[in-house]
Amino acid sequence: MNKKAWTVLLIEDDPMVQEVNRQFIEQVEGFTVIAAASNGLEGVQLIKQHQPDLTIIDMYMPSQDGLTTLQQIRANGYKTDVIAVTAASDIETVRKVLQYGAVDYIMKPFKFERMKQALEQYRSFQVKISQKEHITQSELDSMLFQQFEEKADLLPKGLNAVTLRRIQQYLSEQNHPISAEEVADGVGIARVTARRYLEFLEQENELKLSVEYGRVGRPINRYMLKIN
């Protein structure tokens, strides 16, 4: 049976942001905010009380931050899915949030379209898996790659989400600035392709660019993920 409504719990300390997020969520068909908490401690209690399908958590909060809250949710065995909505963009926080099973990570500031995208992808995946007791590898691949394709609609023409994610992952593993040639070799793509993705990420303010001037030849651009 398809679930026609998903319950959502908001954990956000800023009342104005909390209200904006509530309005965003309830504009998307099939989602209802059933409760809201202003900190992680209160949020965990509300999860226990309401058992929401989806919990949307900010990372920076008083009393108990979002990452600690997410860890506690998993330690207690609560089955709510989690979307992180936060200004935190440092790689270590992103990695930990994903390791604890967040289904999406939305960076502030964001527009309604990004929240809508996250919720629609979540809804689509939940509807599809609710229709089956068992699933094949090809069916699972189709569901997961559909999410990449939907994200690709937001990218400039010629770029795709799968390659972008591979490049972001490769960059996150580096501890020093690297060139487009090194990215191309590491990811297994053409140098000109790597350069296009790196330029896009720089425009999105995700990369720090440094220029290396050698004795001969043209300067070399080197890139590193920003850690705020």
Curated annotation (Swiss-Prot):
Broad class of the protein's primary localization: cytoplasm
PROSITE patterns referenced in this protein's UniProt entry, alphabetically: RESPONSE_REGULATORY
Gene Ontology molecular function, alphabetical: DNA binding; DNA-binding transcription factor activity; phosphorelay response regulator activity
Modified-residue entries (4-aspartylphosphate), positions: 58
Matches recorded under InterPro entries: 2C-system_Tx_regulators, CheY-like_superfamily, DpiA-like_HTH, Sig_transdc_resp-reg_cit/mal, Sig_transdc_resp-reg_receiver, WH-like_DNA-bd_sf, WH_DNA-bd_sf
Start-end of DNA-binding region: 180-199
Subcellular location: Cytoplasm
Function: Member of the two-component regulatory system DctS/DctR. Essential for expression of DctP.
The protein's name in its UniProt record: Probable C4-dicarboxylate response regulator DctR
Source organism (scientific name): Priestia megaterium (Bacillus megaterium)
